[in-house]
């Protein structure tokens, strides 16, 4: 079956009638079975496109959570539904509230640093990752560690670049709102 034929079938009246019945069962099965075979660089874009489609179709654009059971909640991020396990019940196979917190923080720092470098006419690749040190006994995050990876082509003063990256990271509203210790590491590649 060629791609043109599949696209033609997708636009047919039969597909429009069958899709609401089949898609809820077929899409998860197809993703489970075939996602691993999509090349990694294409997989990232594919997943991002799916999420963008889901979010763009949601009317409410709200962020909310619904308690399900011990350590489990159904999260709604602008139409994207996520089964989440958190706290002492967190498992790597599920996205935890802590994962979403860190993703938001890393995204915010990444954008703040990227905009700062761009405003200073520095073209760079920026990636940010993070982890937390938490205490269930104290019921809080004790420390957040953020690693800011910066790759710049060309000759630039490394100390000046590090200083600029750290200055840019201070423009992140999320990190400015956190009361625990935040360690920011700049890694020049």
From Swiss-Prot:
Pfam family, any one: OsmC
Alphabetical list of InterPro entries matching this protein: KH_dom-like_a/b, OsmC/Ohr_fam, OsmC/Ohrsf
UniProt record similarity statement: Belongs to the OsmC/Ohr family.
Protein name, UniProt field: Uncharacterized protein MJ0573
Species of the source: Methanocaldococcus jannaschii (strain ATCC 43067 / DSM 2661 / JAL-1 / JCM 10045 / NBRC 100440) (Methanococcus jannaschii)
């Amino acid at each position: 079956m060629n791609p043109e034929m599949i696209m033609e079938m997708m636009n047919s009246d039969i597909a429009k009638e069958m899709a609401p019945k089949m898609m809820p069962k077929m899409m998860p099965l197809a993703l489970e079975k075939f996602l691993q075979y999509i090349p990694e660089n294409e997989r990232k874009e594919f997943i991002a496109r799916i999420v963008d489609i889901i979010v763009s179709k949601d009317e409410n654009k709200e962020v909310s959570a619904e308690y399900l059971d011990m350590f489990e909640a159904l999260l709604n991020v602008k139409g994207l539904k996520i089964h989440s396990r958190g706290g002492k019940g967190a498992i790597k196979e599920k996205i935890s509230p802590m994962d979403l917190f860190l993703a938001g923080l890393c995204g915010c720092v990444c954008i703040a640093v990227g905009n700062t470098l761009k405003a200073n006419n520095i073209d760079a690749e920026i990636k940010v990752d993070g982890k937390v040190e938490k205490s269930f006994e104290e019921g809080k995050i004790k420390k957040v560690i953020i690693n800011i990876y910066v790759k710049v082509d060309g000759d630039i003063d490394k100390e000046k670049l590090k200083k600029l990256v750290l200055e840019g990271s201070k423009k992140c509203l999320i990190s400015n709102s956190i009361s625990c210790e935040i360690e920011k590491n700049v890694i020049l590649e």
